[in-house]
Amino acid sequence: MHRIVAVPRHATAIRAVADLLSRFRLDFIFVGSVARAAHLGDPVAAGSIDAVATMGPQQKSQLAMMAQNNGFGVDREELDAAEELDLVPITFDGIRVNVLIASNALYGRMVADAESVEFEEIALRVPRAEDFALLLQMNNDVEALMSVVESPRFDRAGYNRKLQAIGLRELVVPE
């Protein structure tokens, strides 16, 4: 696992998201570019900051209100449009932030099993390699997926069991 490195603007956004979700007392993980930085060593330099948080649907509006009171931008129309998606779309200093609600067992387990990784003076949580590989698979990011799968830390048998359990047997990785 690599120490997370980010350009200053994104580093500020990552810290703000971690602070917001921690203050709201949510279990959460960073996915997307932050997880990519942890697993592959790529710096966070562009794009959105994405997190998955364990919370009830009724907490979405509370999170949006708290975000707005802590320097985040909240577009009410966009928030209303995302109602069915279990997503809280916000911004911080012009950077898009997506907080996905862990509304099913797969995401809930991903949050519960997350690993800790260093970022500046704080510890962030990101999905385990096998869960990150599943996210890469769903994003069709074959190059990054192969890098993760070929890592000595990767549990192919565990990954394959998870794929079979969720009905994706055709994506099993040869052992």
Protein language model regions, located:
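Compositionally biased terminal segments of proteins
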Residues: 1-175
